[in-house]
Swiss-Prot record:
Family: Belongs to the herpesviridae HEPA family.
Subcellular location: Host nucleus
Gene giving rise to this polypeptide: U74
Species this chain originates from: Human herpesvirus 6A (strain Uganda-1102)
An annotated GO BP: DNA replication
Function: Component of the helicase/primase complex. Unwinds the DNA at the replication forks and generates single-stranded DNA for both leading and lagging strand synthesis. The primase synthesizes short RNA primers on the lagging strand that the polymerase presumably elongates using dNTPs. The primase-associated factor has no known catalytic activity in the complex and may serve to facilitate the formation of the replisome by directly interacting with the origin-binding protein and the polymerase.
Name the record gives this protein: DNA helicase/primase complex-associated protein
Gene Ontology CC entries for this record: host cell nucleus
Length: 662
């Protein structure tokens, strides 16, 4: 029997021993398949090639066995485990490898039972996206067992890792699964029969004979992805699926039990990417989404997100990514030098580096002040055009041509560098050639090169030239350099902002720049950038305390107006880089949102709840004033510097209490 469609998800069902035929350690894979004709989802099984005992041992390493006191050894053991899992799914024969290319049109050959896939062939280049499906949305609340916080005082690993090590657990929980307008509520006290009845509203259950055993296929009726909020505790997430697995397979006792093994960032002592995968149950994607309560991504965005993985979920590491071929050969000879996404970060000739006292993390603060005009050239679609010209259609996420989606583009780029070396080098080489040519052209125009941000924003300065002359020259330079170095006919979208005579950049954990003064985004960094720009612009020849006081009061008015606005204050932090106050749940094992507290520590701050009363508003004011002080020190004599310090202290004393008034 032949069937046309596409694979939407692939995982392991279990590893079993075929005693009758004396075949041991046989992996059974399960594929969530979208049938083209009926547009319905089906689950098929694939019989894999037998594993050797060593590989099986690496896959079956338990969480308890990974909890080593040597944290680096623990991290290495987890890396080894996920490498074995990824290698099993990606390299267990050509059939399984073909089915791991998601949304690619396939023709599959089924066995007589209509259950097992025997062969699979790619039958088209255009992606077959399941746009008529909807995601399952998980929401969960729970209570945790008490834990002595003295176990969490050290800072050698994440709080999440320490909590797991000392037996942190969920006492009780309640959760819901929502599909479209159907919301199903569950409690940890539900019986197995009740759970199965509820689940059958959005999943189909089918008991089938396979390889001399009975298997249970749990197939989502109209979904291939489950979404949960970034701020959902990962321990609650694990508890939900362990509960569902136990209850369902407790009712269907006669079947071969499906695996249900969680892989997430909390298993690494120093944290990992915000990505989750279950080996076995459930057979669908689990995606973490920012601010899910207010904004549910559409199916197109979910497809793009999955395609940007280049294979399996990111948490399964580089071995879980496809080796993507280059779609065209470059006519320019590529050098053999190592490439890096950080290559164009700073021109150190003009941007100084130092550690400032207001920095709470490990990074240096990079500072630049200039009396020259500053130009910010943005090419929002240059990465998309480069990828479109080099990546085969079957692997290219369908990026929206009307949206920048720069974060998704950068993630996709970073994932290419692990296994798709030739492709990654080709893209970076073209970008390098273009940027080098553009830099030379700017130098010939008398412009100084400062910074490249996120591979598509270029910061430059220029003295004494008319803006109406410079901008057309910059656009011409971009177009000519692009055409000569990339051989791509479509030109990138050109955007340019000019900042007159007040150029500055502060690049640290946060980013402040005179270029942000034109932004409409509501965030403290934008307000601070506008304040600093105004002060620098109007104090070229002398320090006028009357003017900077007025600007400071304007900034304070905006700060006060936003003092309850969570999104205005929160920032994202990498795990284990900063000292974090105790919080409930496992929430700091991947990139998380937080605000600064009064005692200099971070406080976890979710997007969807009220702003914590522990926030230290004075920190954000102090950061802004310290940057202004650095500018004063670089521009004026000791007398003005002393006067500024007095003024700074007076402003803090007179205004800081206003942010705490109700």
């Amino acid at each position: 029997m032949h069937l046309r469609g596409c694979a939407c998800h692939l995982s392991l069902y279990c590893v079993y021993n075929d005693w009758e035929n004396k075949i041991y350690r046989v992996p059974i894979f399960q594929c969530l398949f979208l049938e083209a004709e009926t547009r319905s989802l089906k689950t098929f099984l694939i019989r894999g090639q037998s594993l050797d005992q060593e590989s099986l041992n690496e896959i079956e390493v338990t969480r308890k066995e990974t909890m080593l006191w040597d944290l680096q050894e623990q991290s290495n053991m987890m890396d080894k485990k996920i490498a074995a899992i990824s290698n099993l799914i990606m390299n267990n024969g050509e059939l399984v490898r073909t089915l791991s290319k998601f949304f690619v049109p396939l023709t599959v050959v089924l066995g007589d039972d209509g259950l097992e896939i025997l062969e699979a062939y790619v039958c088209g280049e255009e992606l077959m996206l399941p746009l008529d499906t909807v995601p399952v949305i998980l929401r969960c609340i729970g209570d945790y067992a008490a834990l002595d916080t003295k176990h969490l005082l050290s800072n050698e690993c994440t709080q999440a890792s320490k909590k797991i090590r000392f037996g942190y657990s969920v006492m009780d929980f309640h959760f819901s699964l929502t599909v479209s307008d159907v919301k199903i509520c569950f409690s940890h006290t539900d019986t197995g029969e009740a759970v199965c009845e509820k689940m059958k509203q959005i999943f189909s259950f089918s008991v089938c004979a396979f390889g001399g055993e009975q298997v249970l296929l749990v197939t989502p009726k109209n979904a291939y992805a489950l979404l949960f909020d970034d701020d959902l505790c990962l321990l609650l997430l694990q508890s939900v699926f362990a509960f569902l697995h136990e209850k369902i397979f407790g009712v269907y006792k006669q079947v071969l039990v499906q695996l249900c093994e969680y892989i997430g960032p909390d298993l690494w002592p120093f944290g990992n990417e915000r990505s989750v995968s279950f080996i076995g149950y459930p057979n669908l994607w689990l995606l973490s989404v920012s601010d899910l309560e207010r904004r549910v991504p559409d199916t197109t965005y979910i497809c793009r997100e999955i395609l940007s993985f280049c294979g399996l979920a990111p948490i399964l590491g580089p071995r879980g990514r496809h080796a993507v071929p280059v779609v065209r050969e470059l006519s320019i000879e590529m050098p053999g030098s190592e490439t890096s996404l950080q290559r164009f970060r700073f021109n150190s000739q003009y941007v100084s580096s130092e550690s400032l006292c207001f920095q709470t993390g490990p990074e240096d603060t990079h500072l630049f002040f200039s009396d020259s005009d500053m130009y910010v050239v943005t090419l929002p679609d240059c990465l998309r055009l480069l990828l479109k010209s080099t990546v085969p259609k079957a692997f290219l996420p369908c990026f929206d041509e009307n949206a920048t989606e720069i974060d998704l583009l950068l993630k996709f780029m970073s994932r290419l560098q692990h296994r798709s070396y030739a492709l990654f080098d080709a893209v970076i080489f073209m970008l390098d050639a273009f940027v080098s040519a553009f830099q030379r052209a700017c130098t010939l125009m008398g412009m100084r090169w400062l910074l490249v941000r996120d591979l598509h924003m270029f910061y430059l300065t220029c003295d004494g030239k008319d803006t109406h002359v410079v901008m057309p020259l910059l656009q011409t330079a971009v177009e000519n350099c692009w055409e000569k170095t990339t051989e791509i006919k479509q030109r990138p979208t050109f955007q340019c902002a000019e900042i007159s005579r007040c150029g500055f950049i502060v690049y640290a954990r946060f980013f402040l720049s005179s270029g942000l003064s034109q932004s409409k985004e509501a965030h403290w960094t934008v307000t601070a950038s506008k304040y600093l720009s105004a002060c620098i612009r109007t104090n070229k020849t002398g320090l006028c305390f009357a003017s900077i006081t007025v600007y400071f009061q304007d900034m304070m008015c905006v700060f006060i107006a936003n003092r309850y606005n969570v999104s205005y204050w929160i920032e994202e932090f990498d795990p284990n880089d900063y000292c974090l106050e105790y919080h409930e749940g496992l929430l700091d094992c991947s990139r998380y949102t937080a605000v600064m507290s009064e005692d200099g520590q971070l406080v976890r701050q979710a997007r969807g709840i009220a702003l914590t009363d522990k926030i230290n508003f004075s920190y954000y004011i102090l950061v802004t004033l310290r940057v202004l002080r650095r500018w004063v020190e670089s521009k004026f004599e000791d007398v003005e510097q002393t006067q500024f310090i007095r003024w700074e202290n007076r402003m803090l004393c007179e205004h800081i209490h206003l942010l705490h008034l109700n």
